[in-house]
């Protein structure tokens, strides 16, 4: 005997209503779940208190980084400004980037290590000392590292880069070929804001 189509239709309608109800219940319950907050602080104020800005090492030993004026945090288009403090004896990673970079030394002294961009790898770096109230520029794509060579005092620098956010290539050592350098983009201090900006599209 063939099933009664009206009974099948009624059963399907009941099942559909049940599933729709379950779906609404799940959506309603999900709306009460905590939402993961981004630690990205966006601030387009004309005047900002640096002491109130987020500061972190971002997993880089001996570094304290503040994005004073940035592309992702503050809407900057052409330049980005960082305030960085490097502990005695510590170094930034060996890296290069396709943007201009200018350092102004506010406190302390250190050594700039500069590798070659014209060879297959950075090679033995040139060591260039610097001290408080000096400034130095990094040529585009030249591998470099900033070292607080002082054993007692922090090194504090104001850093300005062009074309933010920076695309940074990291090296394990000075003999690593340029083609093996690893792109880190977004860089560690841009990750939260980069994800938030991407999510807003």
Curated annotation (Swiss-Prot):
SUPFAM superfamilies: RmlC-like cupins. Disulfide bonds join 40-193. Residues 1-38 form the signal peptide. A motif (Prevents secretion from ER) lies at residues 198-201. GO terms for biological process: auxin-activated signaling pathway; cytokinesis by cell plate formation; positive regulation of cell division; positive regulation of cell size; positive regulation of DNA endoreduplication; unidimensional cell growth. Receptor for the plant hormone auxin. This is Auxin-binding protein 1. It comes from Zea mays (Maize). The gene is ABP1.
């Amino acid at each position: 005997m063939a099933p009664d189509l009206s009974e099948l239709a009624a059963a399907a309608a009941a099942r559909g209503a049940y599933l729709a109800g379950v779906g609404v219940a799940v959506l309603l319950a999900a709306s009460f779940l905590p939402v993961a907050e981004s630690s990205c602080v966006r601030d387009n104020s004309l005047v900002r208190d640096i002491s109130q800005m987020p500061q972190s090492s971002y997993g880089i030993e001996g570094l304290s980084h503040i994005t004073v004026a940035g592309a992702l945090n503050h809407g900057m288009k052409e330049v980005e400004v960082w305030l960085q403090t490097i502990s005695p004896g510590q170094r930034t990673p060996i890296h290069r980037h396709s943007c201009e970079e200018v350092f102004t030394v506010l406190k302390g002294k250190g050594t700039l290590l500069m590798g070659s961009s014209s060879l297959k790898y950075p090679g033995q770096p040139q060591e260039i000392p610097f001290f408080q109230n000096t400034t130095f520029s990094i040529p585009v794509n030249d591998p470099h590292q900033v070292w607080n060579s002082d054993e007692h005092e922090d090194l504090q620098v104001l850093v300005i880069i062009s074309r933010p956010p920076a695309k940074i290539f990291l090296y394990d050592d000075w003999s690593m070929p340029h083609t093996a350098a690893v792109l880190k983009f977004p860089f560690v201090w841009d990750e939260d804001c980069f994800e938030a900006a991407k999510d807003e599209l």
